[in-house]
Amino acid sequence: MKETKKLGRFEKLARDVLISTSKMLKDAKIELFDGIHGRVLEVGAGIGVNVYFFNRPEVDHWVAVEPDRKLVDECHKMVADMGDRVSVFQGYLHELEEPPESFDYVVFTTLLCSVPDPDKIVKEAHRFLKPGGKLCVIEHIGDSFGLRAGFQMLAKYPWKLATGCNCRNNPVPALSQPGFWQDVDDRVELKTAPLRTKRFSPMLELLKPFVMTTLTKK
């Protein structure tokens, strides 16, 4: 029987941020994931919370990629009711042994802020998508002015040390690689994601604003 490791302090912080962020992004995820079907690849799946925003009967198979062993264990618990329609892979996207052009959808949520080479991740996602397949993205970006922008600048390095996340993230260059997407000539256009916020949270304020888009492979 596989040993399940307990979450450490930083893993608990990461899990709590994932859950809180997912609640805040509920409306955005319902909108973005509407229509997801077939074979779905999620990169940086964390504990698997996004599955609950899919129309699960329409998902033939969900492949989750997550490098953190402890989060993988949590993910297995989260999606146990989907049975053999789920594969949770502990590792990195470039290590995934799946055929090129074998997925109808690829999902990124708050991923590009925490990887060392966003361009490479987007290229790999593009490789796994079928022609006409869709990349669904929600990311947070660095604010451009005001108190939050200053706070993000001050917190950038300690926050990254604690969580692995760049709170001054800019996903546009990685997503805008030429020749990848239908109806994109130069730069990908990102839409502001709707947020649900019931009470002030300094941690979540640090991550705002959030943006979203769906890109279709040529």
Where on the chain are the PLM-derived regions?
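A short acidic, Gly/Pro-enriched loop at the edge of an enzyme's catalytic core
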Residues: H94-V106
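A short glycine-rich, Lys/Arg-flanked "PGG" loop and its adjoining helix->strand segment in the class I
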Residues: D119-P131
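Short alpha-helix
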Residues: T163-W181
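Core SAM-dependent methyltransferase catalytic element
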Residues: P178-G179, R187-K218
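A short SAM/SAH-binding and catalytic strip from SAM-dependent methyltransferases
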Residues: Y105-D117
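Class I SAM-dependent methyltransferase SAM/SAH-binding core
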Residues: L41-E42, I47-E95
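Conserved beta-strand signature within the Rossmann-like core of class I S-adenosyl-L-methionine
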Residues: G133-H140
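Conserved alpha-helix/loop element of class I SAM-dependent methyltransferases that forms part
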Residues: I19-R39, V49-F53
